[in-house]
């Protein structure tokens, strides 16, 4: 009778330790990748917000000029004239992770018409943040201002400074 020997000389396959090490490495790579992906999404949303503010400001000038330089339009008025697309339906549209708020000042005997637009992240903090920076533009300066902690205003520095 032959003695029982549980070891085979040419075993094939992976041990449990080797599999656990591979799974741990994959987990680390996924964790790093997700963090980088979320950071890239935030940066893309912020770039889109700046571009969108510039576009709205340009469309406001078209609206202003087509109304005998007497008025700026709300989101709804600009949508009716096809100056903005359907993403801007409503009074506070959300586009690419940013909430846009516009205030229009009508022309009066004491003031010229004007507007201000704020673009604020839909979610400003946490894992699901859609952006960090808050942006502002108005009809007087047509310069985009930025604040990294609260809604931006004209007193905040312009982008790039």
Over which residues does each language-model region extend?
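Extracellular/periplasmic head regions of type IV pilus-like filament subunits
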Residues: 58-131, 139-143, 158-161
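N-terminal leader/signal peptides at the extreme start of proteins
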Residues: 1-14
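Aliphatic-rich helix starts adjacent to a transmembrane/signal segment
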Residues: 34-53
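A short acidic/small-residue loop/turn micro-motif
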Residues: 151-154, 159
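Short, exposed beta-strand-loop hairpins at the edges of beta-sheets
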Residues: 143-151
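Secretory/exported precursors with cleavable N-terminal leaders
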Residues: 13-21
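Alpha-helical hydrophobic helix detector
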Residues: 20-36
